[in-house]
Amino acid sequence: AKTAAGITAGAAVVKTARADVYKSILPSSVLGANEMIRTGHIGVGVMGRGNLLNNMKRPDVMPIAVCDLHPRMLAEKHAMAQSKNPDATAHEDYMEVIENKDVDAVICSTTDHWHAMVTIAACDAGKAVYCEKPLSTTVKEGQAMVAAAKRNNTVVQCGTIQRSGQQFQEAIELVKSGVLGQVGHVHTFALNMLAPSGIGNPPDITDPEKWGKFGPWEKYQGWVEHKPFNVNRWLNHFRWFFDYAGGKLTDWGVHLVDIAMWAMGEDKLPKSVSASGGKFIMTDNRTTPDTLNVSWEFDNYLMTYTNRVWTSYADHAMDPDDHGIIFYGTKGTLKLSRKGYKLIPTDNQEFDPEAKQWKKFESAEAKEAMGDGMLYEKHLENFVSCIRSGEKPISHIESCHRSSAVCHIGNAAYLAGAKLTWDGAKEQFVGGPDDAVKQANEWIARPYLNGYTLG
């Protein structure tokens, strides 16, 4: 069986990766404050490029290996890594990176359906791991990833970068402080204008000689059902296909849901979920919906998510924006995004942070935001610090599993077409139409095909 053999845009099929295989290469101790952290980058596409560049900016981090299945991507990022470290190596097989005893931390920026295999193998090899969001493509994968991190006592930071943003941290403290009163509804939304052609309709290609320049397509597909080559199923657009990802909900939605749940209490889990939507506007070949509304019911609040890929205008009473989180409370409302946050009081008041109370106001001014670039830098700083200290990162793997799983069950409810009862402790659906419950539970624990096994 093929186990922990992830590819992405980067890596190849290898034998089972178990902890006992790596006893001879495990790091002997937590890295000291002055030691260089040596990184291996697996998957160096769009997100992988950004993560590589951010690592290269730090004087205490050295890229020593890059890995990708796409020949052009690999060559470009190898040259980039060599601009800082001439001895950096290039690989198609990601296990060569993980088995390299000189690699301290693995940066996993693969397509979503390879996150689990890469992360589990890296944890079992004793490496620190930075894994892009979403953590997984199924709830079952997330469970296995959390288990691998725990059994190896591994530092794992996930790519939910908003946790490192000052405006998000401040806004969360405001919500937790009670100044909004009782929050009964948290709305999240992610919008963009791509109508109607979107990602386009490139043809499937069945002749390997014609698609071979992109790399080993069969290896890239790995454990999922194999399909004819289509350029949209690789490269930048993989996330719009349910084979490899979860659409906008697991792409942008996981960022928003993560912050919403952090503010409302991470120990609180939804008890039911429903979703509606479809592919109504777009004429491209995506398989994920272009319009989606999801509703999760918690014991004492409702969380909702809206996605439309055919309009960038948010139809709410606050500043128009293309993404955000809105906390609706009995004493006020807080709107939060990467652009900043704004408190909108009831009864024409504003919040005085020094007095920690509402007061009359003439106009409400927004708190300015920390830019995206700073979010990534602060997030990496936290990861590096935790590698040295052994402390739990701000986007620790348990938190990202929770937020990713909540998104997965939203997609499951959409595909099953029913409102479903969720048991957060068991992480399975326990109520709803029998056929829908069965379909949804199968979706969140999809089996590995083509000879692959998980963990």
Task: Annotate each predicted stretch with a short phrase.
Residues D20-E35:
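A short, basic/flexible loop-to-alpha-helix module at the beginning of a structural domain
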Residues V44-G45:
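Glycine-rich Rossmann-fold phosphate-binding loop(s) that bind the pyrophosphate
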Residues A105-I107:
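N-terminal Rossmann-like NAD(P) cofactor-binding module of classical short-chain dehydrogenase/reductase
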Residues G48-R49, H115:
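N-terminal Rossmann-fold NAD(P) dinucleotide-binding loop
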Residues A1-S24:
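N-terminal export signals
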Residues T111-D112, A116-S164, G178:
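Beta-strand-loop-alpha-helix segment that lines the small-molecule cofactor/substrate pocket
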Residues Q169-E170, Q182, H187-E398, R402-G455:
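Contiguous beta-strand/loop segments that form the cofactor/metal-binding neighborhood of enzyme cores
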Residues V61-A81:
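NAD(P)-binding Rossmann-fold cofactor-contacting core
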